[in-house]
């Protein structure tokens, strides 16, 4: 059987028509019920005079930067507990984790939580930007350094997070669904991918709090040179190297030489090649099957994003295994 090849070369970017930075379908501040808007202004101590809805990401919660009459700025996230039950639960979970994270982890800080018919998170607003797309080396280096430092700060894992492979158990059986997909590879290659994915519990075990969703729309680069890690709704417990590896999916799709990046990233360079392949196989199976599900009306770009990620990860794994 072919073994992993850490000397795999970069390839051309994976084609996509995703409008990076404009993928979210969201309501505006004005669509919040009057009482909720009144409660927000009461908590913040000043009337809202302007708002700017954020359009990155794939979650259809209200997300907007509020400008108050006193000149301050605040970030608001909100979801209806009736019309958006799962997203409201996600915001509650995010609020709980933001209160759990140690101060040494750079993130957007929670200032207020309103929990009624609407779950509303009020967060500190920081003048920051998203990484450039396509990914640039300087942005990627900054983000990897921040994510690696956070892994140290989050070991041992604070709070009560489920193990990586338990929370994401659905990743492991996806290659059964893809059986017979000749466009993806030979039957033996697909069988091998499934066997690799099945080893997820073994290779991902650890005692680090793992974000699992760090990418260009959850990493915010500050003018001072820092990086904020955002979107802490559903972290898990696992190996310290998982977040740096998962972060490389986007750059891989943009044509970055992720193997060279992997070799010079300390947390990744010491990981067994086969262990990396196991995670890549599980991810590829998940994305390549999820992208075929119906397109959610509230997130019209989600399936295209999953297709793009799936093709990027699968191509990366194929190059590492010598299947191309």
Go through each PLM region and give its residues.
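Juxta-kinase regulatory segment immediately upstream of eukaryotic protein kinase catalytic domains
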Residues: 2-52
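A cross-family kinase active-site recognition segment
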Residues: 2-3, 112-119, 129-188, 204-207, ...
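Short Pro/Gly-enriched beta-strand edge/turn motifs at strand-loop
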Residues: 42-50, 93, 174-176, 192-203
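A short beta-turn/loop motif at secondary-structure boundaries
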Residues: 54-58, 113-116
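Active-site acidic catalytic loop and adjacent metal/ATP-binding pocket
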Residues: 55-68, 74-76, 196-242
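A conserved alpha-helical element in kinase catalytic cores
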Residues: 72-116, 132-150
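A glycine-centered beta->alpha junction motif in the catalytic cores
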Residues: 81, 116-136, 156, 172-181, ...
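Active-site activation/catalytic loop segments of kinase-like enzymes and analogous catalytic loops
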Residues: 241-270, 280-298
């Amino acid at each position: 059987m072919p073994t992993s090849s850490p000397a795999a070369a970069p390839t051309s970017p994976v084609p996509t028509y995703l409008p990076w930075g404009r993928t979210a379908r969201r309501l505006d501040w004005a669509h919040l019920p009057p009482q909720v808007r009144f409660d927000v202004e009461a908590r913040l101590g000043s009337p809202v005079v302007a708002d700017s809805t954020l359009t990155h990401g794939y979650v259809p919660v209200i997300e907007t930067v509020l400008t108050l009459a006193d000149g301050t700025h605040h970030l608001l996230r909100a979801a209806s507990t009736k019309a958006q039950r799962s997203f409201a639960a996600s915001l509650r979970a995010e609020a709980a984790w933001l209160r759990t994270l140690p101060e040494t982890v750079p993130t957007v800080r929670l200032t207020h939580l309103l929990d009624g018919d609407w779950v509303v998170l009020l967060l500190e607003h920081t003048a920051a930007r998203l990484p450039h797309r396509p990914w640039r080396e300087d942005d990627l280096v900054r983000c990897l350094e921040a994510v690696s430092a956070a892994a140290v700060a989050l070991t041992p894992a604070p709070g009560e997070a489920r193990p990586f492979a338990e929370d994401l158990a659905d990743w492991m059986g996806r290659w059964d669904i893809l059986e017979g997909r000749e466009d993806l590879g030979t039957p033996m290659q697909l069988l091998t991918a499934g066997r690799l994915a099945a080893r997820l519990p073994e290779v991902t075990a650890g005692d680090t709090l793992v974000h699992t969703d760090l990418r260009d729309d959850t990493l915010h680069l500050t003018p001072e040179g820092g990086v904020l890690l955002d979107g802490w709704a559903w972290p898990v417990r696992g190996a310290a190297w998982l977040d740096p590896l998962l972060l490389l999916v986007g750059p891989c799709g943009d044509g970055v030489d992720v193997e060279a990046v992997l070799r010079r990233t300390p947390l990744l360079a010491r990981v067994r090649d086969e262990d990396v392949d196991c995670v890549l196989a599980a991810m590829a199976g998940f994305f390549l099957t999820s992208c075929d599900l119906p397109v959610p009306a509230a997130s019209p770009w989600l399936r295209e994003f999953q297709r793009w990620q799936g093709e990027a990860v699968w191509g990366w794994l194929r190059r590492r295994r010598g299947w191309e």
